[in-house]
C-alpha cells in the first residue's frame, strides 16, 4: 500500500509544521524553503477531528489522507467542468478513470505535500472559468468570477509555483486571443465588476491565509514580495537563498526522462496518456477547450523543463492537464461516427489498463528505488533506526524530559536523551519517527557540539552521527556499548546515488 511507504524528508518536515500549528494554534509563513498554509490548516483540522492535538500524537495515515481528499475533490471538480463544457456526464467519468489511474497522480495523492492541493485548486479555477464562459444571467457571471478569484487565491496560498501555471494558461490563451474579433468579444463579455470580483477574491483569500487569519501581516509581505524572489533564486538553482536548491538542478530533458524514459511499466503509462491527449487535441474538429488544455499542459511542461530546478512532483499539474485534455478530446468524438467512438473508448481502456498496472506495481513495494517518482526519498531503514532508539530510551530509568531542543545541554538535564549530530538535510525524516521522544532529543549539525557535550560530563543514552565520524564517538562516550549502521537515504547505483549512511550508538 502506498500509505505504508517510508515518510519522505519533505513530508516529515511538513508534518512537524502541522504539529506546531496544532500545539500553538498559529502559523507563521516562512518564504525560504516552505510553502503556503492551506495544507497545514486542512491537515490540522483533520487531526483535531480525530482528537490529535500535538506533534507526538499526529497520525501519519491521517496526514496522508489530507491530500487524498483533495485529489478526489480535484477529480470531481474536473468532471463538473467537463459537464458544463459538454453538457454530458460521460466525459467526467472518463476523466475520473484516466486521472484516477495516472501512476504519478496515485503516488503523490498520498504524499503529504502541497502538489495535490494545488491541482485541486487549479481544477477549481477551470471549473469556475467554464461556468463563467457559459451563457447565463449577469448575476451568475459575477458569482463565477468570484469563485475563480477565490480558487486562484487558494492556489497561491498553497504553493508559489502556481504562478507558473498562471503563466502557462496565459500562453495557451494567446492563439485564441490572436483570432479576429476575439478582443472585442472579451470586451463585450467581461465587465469591470467581474474583474473586481476576480481580483478581490484572489487578494482577500491570499491575505487571510498568509496572515494567519489577520494575526501576522508580515506573512502577507513575505508571500507577495520575499517569496517570489526566493523562489526565483531557487528556480535557477541558486543555493545562496534556498537550502539545497543546487541538489535539484537537472538538465532540460530530465522531466521527459522521468515521465517517458524510465522503467517501461511507468513510461508506457505516461506515453499512452500523453499520446491520447495529443491526438485528441490535434485531430480535426477538436474543441477549443481541448486545445486550450493541451496547450496549457505543453506550455507548463516547457516552462518547468527550462527552469534548472526540478523535482518529479512539480509535474503533477502537467499530467492532470493531460488527463483533462484526453477526456475532453474523447468527448469531442462522441456522437460522431461510430468507429471513432469505438476507437476513443478502446484508447481510454488501454491507457487506464496500462496506468492501473503501474499503480498496482507501486502498491506492492512503495519504497522501491526503481519507481521514478521515489525521488530524494528516505531509506526504509530509518524505521528500524527509530525502533532501536525507542527501545533504548524506554529501557532507561530516568525519563526526565529536556526543556529545550537544538541548544547545548547543561548538567541540569539528566539522561535519557538522544544526541543527534548530522547535517540538517540528512536529519530528516528521523525527527518524524522519533517524535515521541522529541522533548528528549537534541539536534546539532557538527561533531564539535558532541565534544562540548562530553566536556560537561553528560552521558547521552543514544548518539547518532554520520558514518565517517562513527569511530570518534566511543572515545567520547565509552558507556555506549552497542552500535549499528543505517542508511538514512538509500544507495541507488543505477542513478549514481551514494546514499546517506549513519551510525547509532546506545
Language-model features: where?
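Transmembrane-helix signature of polytopic, membrane-embedded enzymes
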Residues: 57, 78-101, 137-139
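Juxtamembrane segments of multi-pass membrane glycosylation machinery
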Residues: 23-24, 42-69, 88
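Transmembrane-helix motifs of polytopic, lipid-linked glycan transferases
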Residues: 65-86, 124
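Short acidic/glycine- and proline-prone juxtamembrane loop motifs at membrane-interface regions
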Residues: 8-9, 60, 104-117, 161, ...
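Specific aromatic-rich, kink-prone transmembrane helix
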Residues: 77, 117-136, 148-152, 321-325
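Membrane-interface transmembrane helices that cradle and orient dolichyl/undecaprenyl
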Residues: 84-86, 125-145, 155, 174, ...
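Short periplasmic/luminal acceptor-recognition loop of GT-C membrane glycosyltransferases, typified by
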Residues: 382-399, 412-447, 461-467
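Transmembrane-lumen/periplasm boundary regions of multi-pass, lipid-linked membrane glycan transferases
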Residues: 13-24, 35, 41, 49-52, ...
